Amino acid sequence: MNITKIDWQKVNGLLPVIIQNISTREVLMLGYMNEEALTKTIKERKVTFFSRTKQRLWTKGEISGNFLNVEEMSLDCDNDTLLILVDPIGATCHTGEYSCFHQFTSPQSENKKQQFANWAWFIKLEQHLKEKKNADPSNSYTATLHAKGTKKIAQKVGEEGVETALAAVAQDKAEVISEATDLVYHLTVLLHNQDLQWYEIIAKLQERHQGIGLHPEGGNK
């Protein structure tokens, strides 16, 4: 991104900045930056705004610890609005809500918001499990699985897959949820064992579902 393209005169010295979660794509907040705030944000890789009420620079999370870690930045086509993709720590809104945009008008929107929050949590869980790959096996079940190798992990995936299927045949929804949870956990460990992550699986799903009615195995059914 070429920050020299920003038309500071057009925005009266304050650039509107949209903050978006890089993983879930949920819009988290809107703030404003002057040139000093933008320079500080780029240098420190943590979002810093210019507070119009306090008339000073304000790093998001400087009090709460809920920083917005910068991952990507992009100007819009008119060079007068900035989009920042972030990896947020904790809630973004001062009310404790995950996003400042949480006052939806319909139950469907509220459900969508919760889905975003759940997905964000899963991404954090995957990162946590990935970090356990090289941890001390004596203190971590995940590390123990990695220490035992691919065959052991694959065996666990197979076992949990069968148990999930049996629970479904028995029409036991609570057991399906329990076994599917174990299956997803062990499958995540297996992906990390193979130096893969869930985003690669999701990308393949997106590739296979480009057309309406596209079958997961690649054929149209």
UniProtKB/Swiss-Prot annotation:
Phosphoribosyl-AMP cyclohydrolase as annotated region, ranges: 1-121
Name of the featured protein: Histidine biosynthesis bifunctional protein HisIE
InterPro entries: His_synth_HisIE, HisE, PRib-ATP_PPHydrolase-like, PRib_AMP_CycHydrolase_dom, PRib_AMP_CycHydrolase_sf
One CC-aspect GO term: cytoplasm
Main location (coarse class): cytoplasm
Recorded family membership: In the N-terminal section; belongs to the PRA-CH family. In the C-terminal section; belongs to the PRA-PH family.
Superkingdom per UniProt: Bacteria
One BP annotation, GO: L-histidine biosynthetic process
Family annotation (Pfam families): PRA-CH, PRA-PH
Places the protein is found: Cytoplasm
A GO MF label: phosphoribosyl-AMP cyclohydrolase activity
Stretch list, region Phosphoribosyl-ATP pyrophosphohydrolase: 122-221
EC number(s) per entry: 3.5.4.19, 3.6.1.31
Known catalytic reactions: 1-(5-phospho-beta-D-ribosyl)-ATP + H2O = 1-(5-phospho-beta-D-ribosyl)-5'-AMP + diphosphate + H(+); 1-(5-phospho-beta-D-ribosyl)-5'-AMP + H2O = 1-(5-phospho-beta-D-ribosyl)-5-[(5-phospho-beta-D-ribosylamino)methylideneamino]imidazole-4-carboxamide
Enzyme class: hydrolase
Keywords: Amino-acid biosynthesis, ATP-binding, Cytoplasm, Histidine biosynthesis, Hydrolase, Multifunctional enzyme, Nucleotide-binding
Keyword Transcription regulation: no
Pathway assignment: Amino-acid biosynthesis; L-histidine biosynthesis; L-histidine from 5-phospho-alpha-D-ribose 1-diphosphate: step 2/9; Amino-acid biosynthesis; L-histidine biosynthesis; L-histidine from 5-phospho-alpha-D-ribose 1-diphosphate: step 3/9
